Curated annotation (Swiss-Prot):
The gene is trpC. InterPro entries: Aldolase_TIM, Indole-3-glycerol_P_synth, Indole-3-glycerol_P_synth_dom, Indole-3-GlycerolPSynthase_CS, RibuloseP-bd_barrel. This is Indole-3-glycerol phosphate synthase. Belongs to the TrpC family. It holds the Pfam family IGPS. Keywords: Amino-acid biosynthesis, Aromatic amino acid biosynthesis, Decarboxylase, Lyase, Tryptophan biosynthesis. Transmembrane segments: none annotated. It catalyses: 1-(2-carboxyphenylamino)-1-deoxy-D-ribulose 5-phosphate + H(+) = (1S,2R)-1-C-(indol-3-yl)glycerol 3-phosphate + CO2 + H2O.
């Protein structure tokens, strides 16, 4: 069983319990009168050849376990903001990443920077939940969805004022993302089947992006040269988490 399959099975059980506690109709009703979201797309759009930082607030991962023992999400986010982050990515999955919706809510209330919810979304109820949390954008993983699901979810995102970062790992998934109307596409250098990382995944796929689609490189970016590789390839932004905490080079990088 792959990492992704295991995670999605767990998520399906979580969503079933969630919908028992609060039917989707109640989520829809609660989203009827909310303040406008912040513009995630504009925040991460490259200008003058620079590259933007989506800084990830993450406590743990399935492959490496706990990354930050004394985990203080607001302190980490403040550090990222000082570094010049254009947006935050916040893990809300509790089972595999030790994340929490509470972390996301606290960060959205404390900072004016747009916030991406990093989650394994497989049901519409999670999209309404995302909006109610105060997120401005969320992740949609092509490998976790049917193409028709992706299309429907993108439409719901737009109706709720959310932006979607649509994640792909190969050319087939990129084609699906584009065909279904994605306007922000991230390439995950980590293969979610076995969690191996290859930075050339992003470089090679960037050549296939159509004009007008924003590009984000995700995972495995640990050094200044890694970011420069993505900048030279033409990416609008990179999504980095643990690398920022570990690398002085990345902390001193000139973002934007």
């Amino acid at each position: 069983m792959t990492y992704l399959t295991r995670i999605l099975e767990t998520k399906a059980r979580e969503v079933a319990e969630l919908k028992k506690l609060k039917p989707e109709r109640r989520y829809r009703e609660a989203c009827g009168d909310l303040p406008a979201t912040r513009d995630f797309r504009s925040a991460i759009t490259s200008r003058d050849g620079g590259i933007n930082l989506i800084a990830e607030v993450k406590k743990a991962s399935p492959s490496r376990g706990v990354l930050v023992e004394d985990f203080r999400p607001l302190d980490i986010a403040a550090r990222y903001a000082e570094l010049g982050a254009s947006a935050f990515s916040v893990l809300t999955d509790s089972h595999y990443f030790q994340g929490s919706p509470d972390y996301l809510k606290a960060i959205t209330q404390q900072f004016s920077i747009p916030v991406l919810r990093k989650e394994f979304i497989i049901d519409e109820s999670q999209i309404y939940e995302t909006r109610l949390m105060g997120a401005d954008a969320a992740l949609l993983i092509v490998a976790a969805l049917e193409p028709s699901q992706l299309r429907d979810y993108l439409q719901l995102f737009a109706e709720l004022g959310l932006h979607a970062l649509v994640e792909v790992h190969d050319r087939r998934e990129l084609d699906i993302a584009i065909e279904q109307g994605s306007t922000i596409v991230g390439v995950n250098n980590r293969d979610l089947r076995d969690f191996t990382v290859d930075l050339m995944t992003s470089v090679n796929l960037k050549r296939e992006y159509p004009e007008g689609v924003l590009s984000v490189a995700e995972s495995g970016l640990k050094r200044r040269d890694d970011v420069l590789l993505m900048q030279d390839a033409g990416f609008d932004a990179v999504l980095i988490g643990e690398g920022l905490l570990a690398s002085e080079e990345l902390r001193q990088f000139s973002w934007g």
